[in-house]
From Swiss-Prot:
Gene: ruvC
Chief place where the protein resides: cytoplasm
Residues annotated for Mg(2+) 2 binding in this entry: 68
Protein name, entry field: Crossover junction endodeoxyribonuclease RuvC
Keyword Isomerase: no
UniProt binding sites for Mg(2+) 1: 7, 141
Keywords: Cytoplasm, DNA damage, DNA recombination, DNA repair, DNA-binding, Endonuclease, Hydrolase, Magnesium, Metal-binding, Nuclease
Cofactor dependence: Mg(2+)
GO biological process, one term: DNA recombination
Active site, renumbered: 7, 68, 141
Record Pfam families: RuvC (PF02075)
Length: 204
């Protein structure tokens, strides 16, 4: 399954594309940060980010678009920008008939690190391990978008048997968390995510 993750932001919008396989391994396809100038008119900024997201969607043809769920912040202008870009992303996905997954930051952190309060460096470190990258993805918008894609792919994989393909191509000499996960049931991070999901359902 190909997932396109979006870390929404008006100045910097991270977009990460990941292939997730039936053995829960994952492969990096692409990662970009769509940028706009803070001095530009709002409608031009929204159009620029929307065009950037849609260009990547059309290029990579994902099955699912995963977007960070908006949550309250002290900085009203920041949360408004995030909400506006989220709307742009959702419209683009709907226009193409794509499934959408919304995840809170704590859900994503729990999925990839096993800890819902992990900091950005911990998230980036685990994303690099899962994808078998030689360096941490930067900036944080990029690693957050990839983490969203991984989280959505693992959730889809645990909700139905088999995702796209059987096993990711092997990268010689690169150790990753996915290697230990292959064929061995949920990883520790996935198990933590499942526990968090069950706890959330219990509070509803």
């Amino acid at each position: 399954m190909r997932i396109l993750g979006i870390d929404p932001g008006l100045t910097r919008c991270g977009v990460g594309v990941v292939d997730v396989y039936a053995d829960r391994s994952a492969r990096l396809v692409d990662v970009q940060v769509v940028r706009t100038s803070p001095t530009a008119e709002l409608h031009h900024r929204l159009l620029a980010v929307g065009d950037g997201i849609e260009e990547l969607v059309d290029r990579h043809r994902p099955s699912v678009v995963a977007v960070e769920r908006v949550f309250a912040q002290d900085n009203l202008s920041t949360v408004m920008g995030v909400a506006q870009i989220t709307g742009v992303a959702l419209v683009g996905a709907a226009r193409r008939g794509l499934d959408v997954a919304l995840h809170t930051p704590s859900e994503v952190k729990a999925a990839v690190t096993g800890y819902g309060q992990a900091d950005k460096r911990q998230v980036a470190t685990m994303v690099a391990r899962i994808l078998g990258l030689d360096e941490l993805p930067t900036p944080a918008d990029a690693s957050d978008a990839l983490a969203l894609a991984i989280c959505a792919g693992w959730r889809a994989g645990m909700s139905r048997a088999g995702i796209a393909g059987t096993q990711a191509p092997t990268r010689t000499g690169v150790a990753s968390a996915a290697d230990a996960a292959a064929g061995a049931g949920p990883t520790a991070a996935q198990a933590a995510w499942l526990a968090a999901e069950r706890a959330q359902r219990g509070r509803r």
